[in-house]
């Protein structure tokens, strides 16, 4: 008789922009937020929010909170700004994924869910541009 612990799946959403990294861990349906952390929550200076180190600390904080609530396996969804913004994730995406993997979660799948337009998109600022 082997006493296997039941695997509870969750979804880790990593939003990595050029200015911050947000990590949200939800249940498998996505309806209930289990833990949430960002680069700005774990560092003191604003200029350190987008750093890989802040992303790693935020991922560790979210992971420990999710572990305490019973999540043992996660699917990871990585997202950049998308739309008229950057289509590539910011500097905190890779360290956040690595920290979630090292935290002891079973990793299901990692996918990029950045919103990409299938036609052109109109940038903000209007016809004559942003007047400074």
Curated annotation (Swiss-Prot):
PROSITE patterns: RIBOSOMAL_S11 (PS00054)
BP term (GO), one: translation
Gene3D superfamilies assigned: Ribosomal protein S11
Pfam families assigned to the protein according to its UniProt record, in alphabetical order: Ribosomal_S11
GO MF annotations, alphabetized: rRNA binding; structural constituent of ribosome
Keywords: Ribonucleoprotein, Ribosomal protein, RNA-binding, rRNA-binding
Gene Ontology, cellular component aspect: ribonucleoprotein complex; ribosome
Claim: Ribosomal protein is one of the keywords in the record: yes
Family classification: Belongs to the universal ribosomal protein uS11 family.
Function summary: Located on the platform of the 30S subunit.
Assembly with partners or alone: Part of the 30S ribosomal subunit.
Name used for this protein in its record: Small ribosomal subunit protein uS11
């Amino acid at each position: 008789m082997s006493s296997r612990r039941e695997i509870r799946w969750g979804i880790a959403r990593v939003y990595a922009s050029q200015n911050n990294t947000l990590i949200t861990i939800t249940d498998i349906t996505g309806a209930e937020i289990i833990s949430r952390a960002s680069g700005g929550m774990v560092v003191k200076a604003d200029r350190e929010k987008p750093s890989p180190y802040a992303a790693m600390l935020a991922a560790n904080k979210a992971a420990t909170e999710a572990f305490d609530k019973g999540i043992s396996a996660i699917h990871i969804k990585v997202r950049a700004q998308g739309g008229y913004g950057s289509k590539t994730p910011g500097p905190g995406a890779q360290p956040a994924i690595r920290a979630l993997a090292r935290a002891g979660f079973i990793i299901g799948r990692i996918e990029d869910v950045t919103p990409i337009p299938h036609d052109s998109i109109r940038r903000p600022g209007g016809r004559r541009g942003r007047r400074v």
